[in-house]
């Protein structure tokens, strides 16, 4: 129904003030919902930035070098603990970035690997 009122009010010259009021009300209605959405987005980005700063410092604490540009790292991903064995590379800015080569183990898989270390060592010695 509001669309028909707009058409009628725009066609008649006597209701110009009514159409201006309608336009102002519509503008206010449109502006009001947008403001909270923008505030939420900026809050989310600031939270993301602060969490990324925290994760980068904790990532350094949980990285153990096992070779040239190869590391074992312990991290939290979507609420799950993962043990990564991964190669890293240096980007042009000098930052270390994770490479494609690597594997992520959950704690159960990590325990199974640790239990089989002696068997793996024996197999390496035989070769």
From Swiss-Prot:
Q: Where is this region: Regulatory?
A: 2-50
On the tree of life, the source organism's domain of life is Eukaryota
Swiss-Prot/TrEMBL puts the cross-link Glycyl lysine isopeptide (Lys-Gly) (interchain with G-Cter in SUMO1) at: 68
State which gene encodes it: SUB1
Q: Does the keyword Repressor apply?
A: no
What Gene Ontology terms describe where this protein resides (cellular component)?
A: extracellular exosome; nucleolus; nucleoplasm; nucleus; transcription regulator complex
Task: List the residue(s) that the UniProt entry marks as the site Cleavage.
Answer: 50-51
Q: What is this protein called?
A: Activated RNA polymerase II transcriptional coactivator p15
Which residues are annotated with the PTM N6-acetyllysine?
35, 53, 68
The UniProt keyword set, sorted, is:
Acetylation, Activator, DNA-binding, Isopeptide bond, Nucleus, Phosphoprotein, Transcription, Transcription regulation, Ubl conjugation
Q: Where is the composition biased (Basic and acidic residues)?
A: 31-44
In the record, the note on similarity to other proteins reads:
Belongs to the transcriptional coactivator PC4 family.
Q: Which terms does the UniProt entry file under GO BP?
A: negative regulation of DNA metabolic process; positive regulation of transcription initiation by RNA polymerase II; regulation of transcription by RNA polymerase II; RNA polymerase II promoter clearance
């Amino acid at each position: 129904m509001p669309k028909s009122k707009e058409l009628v009010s725009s066609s008649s010259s006597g209701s110009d003030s009514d159409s201006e009021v309608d336009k102002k009300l519509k503008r206010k209605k449109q502006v009001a919902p947008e403001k909270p959405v923008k505030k939420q987005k900026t809050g989310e980005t600031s939270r993301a930035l602060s969490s990324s700063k925290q994760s980068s410092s904790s990532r350094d604490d949980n990285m153990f070098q096992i070779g040239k540009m190869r590391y074992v790292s312990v991290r939290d991903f979507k609420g799950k603990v993962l043990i990564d064995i991964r190669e890293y590379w240096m980007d042009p800015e000098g930052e270390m970035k994770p490479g494609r080569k690597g594997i992520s183990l959950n704690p159960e898989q990590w325990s199974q690997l640790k239990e089989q270390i002696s068997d793996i060592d024996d197999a390496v010695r035989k070769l």
